[in-house]
Structures are given as structure tokens and as C-alpha cells.
Amino acid sequence: MFIISGRTMLKKAQQEGYAVPAFNIHNLETLQVVVETAAELRSPLIVAGTPGTFSYAGVGNIVAIAAELAKSWNHPLAVHLDHHEKLADIKMKVAAGVRSVMIDGSHFPFADNIALVKSVVDYCHRYDVSVEAELGRLGGQEDDLIVDGKDALYTHPEQAREFVEKTGIDSLAIAIGTAHGLYTAEPKLDFERLTEIRQRVDVPLVLHGASGLPTRDITRAISLGICKVNVATELKIAFSGALKNYLTQHAEASDPHHYMIPAKAAMKEVVRKVIADCGCEGKL
């Protein structure tokens, strides 16, 4: 089996003090980049997609391509549902072969969030599918999800303990000052809050919104209990920036082989950097 649950790899990261990168992908080329780079560096890997990505590319296509790439590189990986909000949607994608999901009920009141997440956990654990959930809200935009900065809420440590106990989740995404998208000013992460959450919660902790974070912040967050680091925007910017630059310089270009190569190379450098920041090279 080359498509696996994220549970074991996150537990190993927790025990050994590194983080597993979760890279958001969109198509064949972005899948190729993250799998090939992770395989070359022997890094554990989570390939993530938002509802919009799976709608665009097709869940069956993503799972099949990821499985074939994983097999060809002899590199097991998790295909992960990022920021999914509906149990019915999750059921359909689990049936298609996904083995790692994030249910996002962070926009609901605390009790309703627990109820939704518990229903997803009860279903997914029957099929050995790992479940991540979010408590607190990150500002910024992810796919079609937009959270105004004033509506962003940090995770409350004591609520985190209750949330994990009542839902049975495998990992918890927390809000400590990161945001989706790029930062207009250097973020100030609440490391004290992270420490307090870690003291109360025994499941692996997840950091969303890591694009553009300084290496020192990622390293410190991992030392305090972060076991999974999500990166999306930074990958898209590198890929699309190189693509636009090539087409600007070669206005008559029409062969995808030519303009996809520099785009993939630019994205690959970001993937390599994130793996280094996570301290997970050679940890597969």
C-alpha cells in the first residue's frame, strides 16, 4: 500500500521531534514535484488538496496519480483532504481511496464543532482514516474559505484539551498567529500559547498558514510540539511566477514541456526548503 493514513507518520514525528510537511497540490505537475522531491530526500510526505482542488482535478485522478508516483518512487505517502466541511463529501473521497482527512468546523460554535468532528471521526476510524480538526480560526484565504482578520480566533488551551477528549481526533490544527496566504507584515506567533496547548493535549499538533514564515519560527514551533506543517501559497507563487516569467520571455511558446520545466524547478526549491525547515529529511 502506497497511499497510507497520516496517523503513523505524525506519531513518529511527535516522538522524534520533527514535523511532516503537507504540501497543497493542484495538478499532475505539482504532484510530481512534491513526490519526486520528498522521495529524493527520503522525507515523509502528505499531499493535500482543498475541496476546490479535488473538484478541479477529480478525486479519483488525484488518488490514482499519487499512488502511481508513490509506487514508482517506492515512497508511501498520505493523500489528505484539507479544510473539508461536509461529512458526505468526506465519505465520498474516503471511498475513492483517501486515508487522511481534515474536517473544518472551526466556524461553528464549540459544541457544534465537537459534534461535527465526532461524526467524522466515528466514520473515518472504521476505515483506518486519520482525522485532523481545527480549533480556533486562521485569518486569510484558503480556497473559497475567507476569514477576515478580525474574525480570527486563537486556540484556547483548555478548550483544546476538551475538544481532543470529546472528539477522538488524531491531530489538532491550532491557531497561534499564522494566517492563510502571504503575510503583509512579519507574523508574531504565540509560542506561550503553543506550549500551554502542548501541555494539555497529547495528539500531534498542526500548523496551518506556514507559507512565508521565517525558518526560526518554524523550528521553534516544532520544538514546542508542532508535528505537521502546511504549505500552500508559497508553492503556488513559485510555480506561477516562474511560469509567467517564462511566457513573458518566450511569448510564442506553446509547448507545455518547455514552460512547465522552470515552473516545476521553482516549486521544487520551495519544497526542499520546507523539508529542511521541518527537519524531516531522511525520516521516512
From Swiss-Prot:
This entry's Gene Ontology molecular function terms read:
tagatose-bisphosphate aldolase activity; zinc ion binding
Q: Which cofactor does it need?
A: Zn(2+)
Residues where Zn(2+) binds: 83, 180, 208
Pathway the protein takes part in: Carbohydrate metabolism; D-tagatose 6-phosphate degradation; D-glyceraldehyde 3-phosphate and glycerone phosphate from D-tagatose 6-phosphate: step 2/2
InterPro entries per the UniProt record, alphabetical: Aldolase_TIM (IPR013785), Class_II_FBP_aldolase (IPR050246), FBA_II (IPR000771), TagBP_ald_KbaY/GatY (IPR011288), TagBP_aldolase_GatY (IPR023955)
Q: Which residues form the active site?
A: 82 (proton donor)
Residues where dihydroxyacetone phosphate binds: 181, 209-211, 230-233
Q: Which GO terms describe its cellular component?
A: cytosol
SS bonds (residue pairs): none
- Record GO biological process: D-tagatose 6-phosphate catabolic process; galactitol catabolic process
Amino-acid biosynthesis: is it a keyword of this entry?
A: no
Return the EC number: 4.1.2.40
- Name the UniProt key words of this record, in alphabetical order: Galactitol metabolism, Lyase, Metal-binding, Zinc
Matches recorded under Pfam families: F_bP_aldolase
* Cofactor binding description: Binds 1 zinc ion per subunit.
| Catalyzed chemical reaction(s) | D-tagatofuranose 1,6-bisphosphate = D-glyceraldehyde 3-phosphate + dihydroxyacetone phosphate
Assembly state and interactors? Forms a complex with GatZ.
By sequence similarity, the record places it as follows: Belongs to the class II fructose-bisphosphate aldolase family. TagBP aldolase GatY subfamily.
The role this protein plays is: Catalytic subunit of the tagatose-1,6-bisphosphate aldolase GatYZ, which catalyzes the reversible aldol condensation of dihydroxyacetone phosphate (DHAP or glycerone-phosphate) with glyceraldehyde 3-phosphate (G3P) to produce tagatose 1,6-bisphosphate (TBP). Requires GatZ subunit for full activity and stability. Is involved in the catabolism of galactitol.
List the HAMAP family: TagBP_aldolase_GatY (MF_01294)
In Swiss-Prot or TrEMBL terms, this protein is called: D-tagatose-1,6-bisphosphate aldolase subunit GatY
This protein's gene is called: gatY
